[in-house]
């Protein structure tokens, strides 16, 4: 297979690559359906995915995944898929997003971006929230049958991250009081996570802490700044009742300062201590499926979304990976610092959609580095030119 012109140009100009993967909150079914329909080279990828999911479905509680994980039927006939509220639920979307971004990666490796070439020229990799999981998968450097063996394990792992998170939190069903309270102040579709756009991280943290103190909230009842995305766009996680109280407390100020308050399409509060209880379930799942990796298994640096450290230096990668997706706060500036601060680096984002690409662009500042998205038709033309 010929090496893509984009890669050859990067090498000739002395540019390194940075690989990144998106996180929750992105629509995925349309993008994944298009890959399923239009990419014959992904036949083995989808067959492996469907077989892997079928192995786990019988042991799952129907209360958590009431309409199952019938991705094969949904992709063959998108019109027959469940409604958006089910597809965006934490236990389902985490799987759909992982499949979409990994399919984008595999598709690109079949078009002149062979794994060996990508990794040989990579500065490193990371992923926004759950995107750190495929970043580790890719960094193993596996190809062919060896890749699909690992892919199957990673798919089971991410399935259980979403499933156990929802199991712990319970099926999301906001009370009439919460629905009415949000409606009265003009907010829609309450959720356990909300984007607050317009406060600095320090300003938001101060207001979150004041809310917890004034209302006597602590532990699983408190609210937390859970994802520090850009200088003025961050996420707060917590019970919808507490998030509503936070919103009411500062709504006048938010309106005055034009601060946006937008609920995410998800059904569990990730990246905060409310998920501490998954320590009792996920490690057992990991042991059962054989999900165990060391830092020395990684062929390129994978940067932590909590503190930016290189996972290659970790004796164990598996447990930190679980904790970074479910429990620990995300600091996107730390995860992408090496990309932002190293000259002559080109980023490739594997989606889904362009959300994580835009988050990274917002942190580039004066850097001249560029990042292209495999989910963007315009950017794909550049990558495959």
Annotated model-derived regions:
Residues 138-324:
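Alpha/beta catalytic cores of group-transfer enzymes, especially the acyltransferase/condensing modules
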Residues 1-5, 130, 165:
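Long, contiguous juxta-domain segments that are non-catalytic but functionally important
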Residues 126-127, 235-236, 349:
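Conserved SAM-binding loop
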Residues 101, 123-131, 135:
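Gly/Ala-rich beta-loop-alpha elbow adjacent to hydrolase catalytic centers
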Residues 24-27, 129, 133, 240, ...:
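Gly/Ser/Thr-rich beta-alpha loop segments that engage phosphate groups in nucleotides
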Residues 1-122, 273, 277, 284-287, ...:
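Acyltransferase/transacylase module recognition
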Residues 8, 88, 125, 135-138, ...:
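Beta-strand elements of modular eukaryotic interaction domains
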């Amino acid at each position: 297979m010929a090496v893509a012109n984009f890669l050859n140009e990067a090498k000739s100009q002395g540019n390194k690559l940075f690989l990144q993967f998106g996180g929750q909150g992105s629509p995925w079914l349309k993008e994944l359906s298009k890959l399923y329909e239009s990419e014959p080279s992904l036949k083995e990828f989808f067959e492996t995915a469907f077989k892997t999911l079928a192995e786990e479905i019988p042991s799952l509680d129907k209360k958590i995944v009431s309409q199952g994980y019938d991705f094969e039927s949904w992709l063959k006939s998108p019109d027959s898929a469940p409604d958006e509220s089910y597809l965006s639920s934490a236990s389902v979307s985490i799987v759909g997003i992982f499949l979409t971004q990994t399919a984008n990666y595999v598709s690109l490796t079949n078009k002149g971006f062979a794994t060996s070439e990508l990794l040989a020229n990579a500065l490193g990799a990371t992923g926004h929230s759950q995107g750190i999981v495929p970043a580790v998968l890719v960094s193993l450097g596996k190809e062919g049958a060896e890749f699909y063996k690992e892919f199957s394990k990673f798919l089971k792992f991410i399935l259980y991250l979403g499933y156990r998170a929802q199991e712990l939190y319970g099926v999301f069903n906001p009370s009439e009081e919460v629905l009415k309270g949000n409606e009265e102040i003009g907010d829609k579709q309450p959720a356990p996570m909300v984007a607050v756009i317009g406060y600095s991280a320090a300003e938001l943290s101060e207001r979150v802490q004041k809310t917890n103190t004034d209302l006597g909230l602590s532990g699983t009842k408190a609210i937390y700044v859970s994802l520090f995305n850009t200088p003025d766009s961050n996420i707060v996680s917590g019970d919808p009742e507490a998030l509503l109280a936070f919103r009411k407390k500062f709504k006048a100020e938010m309106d005055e300062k034009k601060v946006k308050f937008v609920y995410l399409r998800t059904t569990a509060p990730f990246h905060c201590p409310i998920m501490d209880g998954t320590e009792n379930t996920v490690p057992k799942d990991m042991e059962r499926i054989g999900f165990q990796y060391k830092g020395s298994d990684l062929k390129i640096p994978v940067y932590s979304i909590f503190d930016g450290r290189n996972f290659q230096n970790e004796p164990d990668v598996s447990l930190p990976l679980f904790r970074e997706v479910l429990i620990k706060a995300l600091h996107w500036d730390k995860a992408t610092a090496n990309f932002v601060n190293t000259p002559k680096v080109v980023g490739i984002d594997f989606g889904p959609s362009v959300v994580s690409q835009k988050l990274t662009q917002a942190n580039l500042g004066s850097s001249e580095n560029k990042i292209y998205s495999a989910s963007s038709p315009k950017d794909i033309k550049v990558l495959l030119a």
